[in-house]
Amino acid sequence: MTLNKLYFDGGEEIRDLTIVGGGPTGIFAAFQCGMNNISCRIIESMPQLGGQLAALYPEKHIYDVAGFPEVPAAGLVESLWKQTERYNPEVILGETVTRYRKLDDGSFEVTVSSGKVFLSRALLIAAGLGAFSPRKLPQLNNIDDLEGRSVFYAVKNISDFVGQRVVIVGGGDSALDWTVGLLNAAAEVTLVHRMHEFQGHGKTAREVLEAKESGRVNVFLNTEVRSVDREGEVLTAVHLRSKSGKSRRIEADRLLLLIGFKSDLGPLAGWDLELADNALVVDSHMKTSVDGLYAAGDIAYYPGKLKIIQTGLSDAAMAVRNSLTYIKPGEKIRHMFSSLKGAKEKRNAPDNG
């Protein structure tokens, strides 16, 4: 018997918890469900698990997750799933949750974009920042057909930039990270930022400036991209203009626009839940303004919230733990240390030898 069948009332359609969002927070929430012996399903709008890490930054390295001095985004997602998959959570990909309804018995019904309906005893929103789309430069209105060929908004495959003359636009962490990350792959790297100083991590900013001093990267501050040159479907150059009015033409094969993403709560915004800072307000138990409906990760707001992966994982653990009293009212909730549970699972595992 799998954990997905422990608390069913007879049908296999209902789960104890539906998790909306399959990023790191959502995956770890599913792991916590397994640790707490409740069934769950993950509903993810993208065609794969991992959220923005998988969709936008699979080759980006992350440095602020406890226990990992350095880990590629795709590697972190893979590790989280490896940790979780032994509990066999139901996973539904490529479906967006469009509405929810709390039923008279306190359970929840969610409807997805295809019209399918899923039932669960509680609901956890772990949808990150909601739907996201890259910020674009309004003055570049002739590059849509170059996107994915010569113009990019994220680095999904470093091979797209190997041996190419790359112009990177931005001054935050992503722009700085990939300026450093592409130095040994690209034929030439140029970083353009419209402000007079970088907004990204100080250590990476120093690496960029050191690379500039050694002639490995071109850096233009107080400068904007004004237009591009192209030959058919091929980018050939980028035109820059500084705030002082100086113009410059940079020959380029790739334009990498790393100026952030616009987030949109989408259907969540109309769910009649309390909002603050474009997120769902939660209490100390990660519960929203609706009893039985929880939120975790970037989509959850509480005073002092720090939007990093580590916090999302902690949110997920608290949300699942606190949902138990709603899912199984009247039952005494006992905490089991992971070391003890792991040992118990090993003892109960079938002997394949």
UniProtKB/Swiss-Prot annotation:
GO MF terms listed in the record are:
ferredoxin-NADP+ reductase activity; flavin adenine dinucleotide binding; NADP binding
Q: Which reaction does it catalyse?
A: 2 reduced [2Fe-2S]-[ferredoxin] + NADP(+) + H(+) = 2 oxidized [2Fe-2S]-[ferredoxin] + NADPH
Instruction: Please share the entry's free-text remark on the cofactor.
Output: Binds 1 FAD per subunit.
Residues passing through the membrane, by range: none
InterPro entries the record matches = FAD/NAD-bd_sf (IPR036188), FAD/NAD-binding_dom (IPR023753), Fd--NADP_Rdtase_type_2 (IPR022890), Ferredoxin-NADP_redctase_2 (IPR050097)
- Keyword terms: FAD, Flavoprotein, NADP, Oxidoreductase
* Domain of life where this protein originates: Bacteria
What EC number(s) are associated with this protein in UniProt? Answer: 1.18.1.2
Q: How the protein assembles, per its UniProt entry?
A: Homodimer.
What's the protein called, per UniProt? Ferredoxin--NADP reductase
